């Protein structure tokens, strides 16, 4: 209710300034740190017990500034990042565009972040607070050895992470998506799976929606072979459906409502290709309870939101979690785990 009143003022700001405002507000607001505790929503993925399956996707809290405030809003987990070894400014501004008529966002941020030292200091300071925190890592744009960057980041962030995500699917770092190719992916996973050590947190992989069937099959096969913790499906798309907003032709990754059909189909593709052998995290165009329920029934053990928060506000996580509780009761299910892949 409150967000609907202040949304016009927030949306009058430049999108990047509005995002910064939201981070600063979360730092300052006296938020009630009550987490949704319906036991029927608890789900175990890669050995981690998630209190509910609704999380914040990477990209919102790039520098690990407000993970605990987000958990206090009712999210079951928060994925911070993407974080790179060295600080980088990202691409020139403007680089973030709000497509209000399409309930979408286009970004070409380019892994802008304060770097590993800053993130590590913040994550170390809050480590005793608990909660499920994923850390999404990337490579510096000018790196001579991107696989080494990923291995370094996984090793450095492992002590503070519930899980680690190798983000090789951003369209805004030239050549990054080439790491999804079969040979490169095998080398990457060999490096990052070894980096955290035998007792380290599980490693997830975030993939693009813009994949051919052969790519899906190859990624699924390698992920199973390497014992990946989960696949996050999917990142933003470079494709452009029929959009109505003024900034529809800006370059970058498209997220929000127009991504939903593609992200849902790609999730189903990976569910089929993996045969349920690896947990899936559904992300892309999830804005409602029905969206989350559909993604879970299509095979997602967890779901993540980000762009929808631009339009629905910070209460979205708690709203979806409560709605999923109702869905379980309506379908006579005792646990959200019963709903996974039940379509």
Swiss-Prot record:
Membrane topology category: Peripheral membrane protein
Entries under PROSITE patterns matching the protein: DHODEHASE_1, DHODEHASE_2
Biological process terms in GO annotation: 'de novo' pyrimidine nucleobase biosynthetic process; 'de novo' UMP biosynthetic process
Pfam families reported for this sequence: DHO_dh (PF01180)
Residues the record lists as binding FMN: 58-62, 82, 136, 167, 206, 234, 256, 285, 306-307
Uppermost EC category: oxidoreductase
Protein location: Cell membrane
EC number, as in UniProt: 1.3.5.2
Residue positions of the active site: 170 (nucleophile)
CDD domains cross-referenced by the UniProt entry: DHOD_2_like
SUPFAM superfamilies linked: FMN-linked oxidoreductases
Signal peptide location: none
Reactions it catalyzes: (S)-dihydroorotate + a quinone = orotate + a quinol
Coiled coil: none
Entry GO CC: cytoplasm; plasma membrane
Necessary cofactors: FMN
Cofactor note: Binds 1 FMN per subunit.
Gene3D superfamilies membership: Aldolase class I (3.20.20.70)
Protein function: Catalyzes the conversion of dihydroorotate to orotate with quinone as electron acceptor.
Binding partners and assembly: Monomer.
The protein's name: Dihydroorotate dehydrogenase (quinone)
Species this chain originates from: Erythrobacter litoralis (strain HTCC2594)
């Amino acid at each position: 209710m409150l967000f609907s009143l202040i949304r016009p003022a927030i949306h009058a700001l430049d999108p990047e300034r509005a995002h910064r405002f939201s981070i600063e507000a979360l730092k300052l607001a006296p938020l009630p740190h009550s987490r949704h505790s319906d036991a029927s929503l608890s789900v175990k993925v890669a050995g981690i017990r998630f209190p509910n399956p609704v999380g914040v996707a990477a990209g919102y809290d790039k520098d690990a500034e407000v993970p605990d405030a987000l958990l206090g809003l009712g999210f079951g987990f928060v994925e911070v990042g993407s974080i790179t070894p060295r600080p980088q400014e990202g691409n020139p501004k403007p680089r973030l565009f709000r497509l209000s008529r399409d309930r979408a966002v286009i970004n070409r941020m380019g892994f802008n972040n304060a770097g590993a030292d800053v993130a590590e200091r913040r994550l170390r300071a809050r480590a005793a607070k608990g909660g499920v925190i994923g850390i999404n890592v990337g490579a510096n744009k000018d790196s001579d050895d991107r696989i080494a960057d990923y291995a370094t980041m996984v090793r450095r962030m492992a002590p503070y992470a519930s899980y680690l995500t190798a983000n090789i699917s951003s369209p805004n770092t030239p050549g990054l998506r080439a790491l999804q190719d079969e040979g490169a992916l095998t080398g990457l996973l060999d490096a990052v799976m070894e980096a955290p050590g035998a007792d380290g947190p599980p490693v997830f992989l975030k993939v693009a929606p813009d994949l051919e069937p052969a790519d899906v099959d190859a990624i699924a096969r390698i992920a199973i072979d390497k014992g990946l913790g989960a696949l996050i499906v999917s990142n933003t798309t470079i494709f452009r459906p029929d959009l109505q907003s003024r900034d529809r032709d800006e370059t970058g990754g498209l997220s929000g409502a127009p991504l939903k059909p593609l992200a849902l189909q790609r999730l189903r593709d990976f569910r089929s290709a993996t045969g349920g052998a690896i947990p899936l995290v559904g992300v892309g165009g999830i804005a409602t309870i029905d969206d989350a329920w559909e993604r879970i029934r299509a095979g997602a053990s967890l779901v993540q939101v980000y762009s929808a928060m631009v339009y629905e506000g910070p209460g979205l996580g708690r709203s979806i979690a409560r709605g999923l509780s109702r869905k379980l009761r309506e379908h006579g299910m005792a646990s959200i785990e019963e709903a996974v892949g039940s379509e």
